[in-house]
Amino acid sequence: GDVYKRQGETYDWDACRAVMEKHNDEVRNEQEKWNFMATPYTAAALTVPNLFHTFYYAFSGGRNPEIMKAERKVMKILEQAYESKTNCFPKTRYRAITWGGPPCYWLQFPNWLYNCWGILVIAGMDLFSGNVLIDTTDEDTMLDGIARNYETGVMRRHLTGGWQHLVEFWDEAEKFHCDMVILHDDITCKGALGLTGVILDQAKEKKTKLMMVSNDMFDHRTVSRADIRQQVNDYMYSVMQAEPLDASLLQYDDYEGW
């Protein structure tokens, strides 16, 4: 009331409701995409799904009409690949999910994993943020839904959340039929902190393989792209007893690559 008097404006709850309902449409569409991504015939994997979710979907919240236009095109591609039983990623040896803060200075990391080792990254942690359906019945239910949606934000739910935020990846890996989890030990955000030991203990009881890879999120000088590749190479050789699909990609000089 006092804010309204001072500003001379009244909050438009009808406009809020309209935007929240569009947000719900985006959420339902996102969840439908996951059903296709869980199959062997997904046309969505590697870097693109996470990038789209993080930089377009997450910043829309029902306000950007271009989101659903793009999503409808994506859905057609997913449906066509599934109906025709097309294997869009024929070099796949392992299906993986990534969790934790990724190296923002190497967004093509999933593409390298696939081309070098046949590791198909189906989904990443960022994909599971901001997907709460909001009850638009009244003002209180909308505010409650908005708050719960904020709770699932990347820096809240996945890294410093107040519940079983980090270990949810075991369940997500199972939903997407993944046999490998790549846990980003992001030193900028202090990684998994004290949960690292818990995660390693849990991994001993799981059939899903766990690979921990360090990065420094925004600073390639601390943990370079070559350092990240070497961590993966060492794991694949020693733990998985695997050979690369393309040995020429094991290491190369991209230190100055901006």
List each model region and its residues:
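Long, well-ordered, tryptophan-enriched scaffold segments
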Residues: D12-A38
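Active-site proximal loops enriched in glycine and acidic residues that flank catalytic Cys/His/Asp
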Residues: G100, A123-D126, I182-I187, S214-M217
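C-terminal hydrophobic structural anchor segments
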Residues: W163-K207, M211
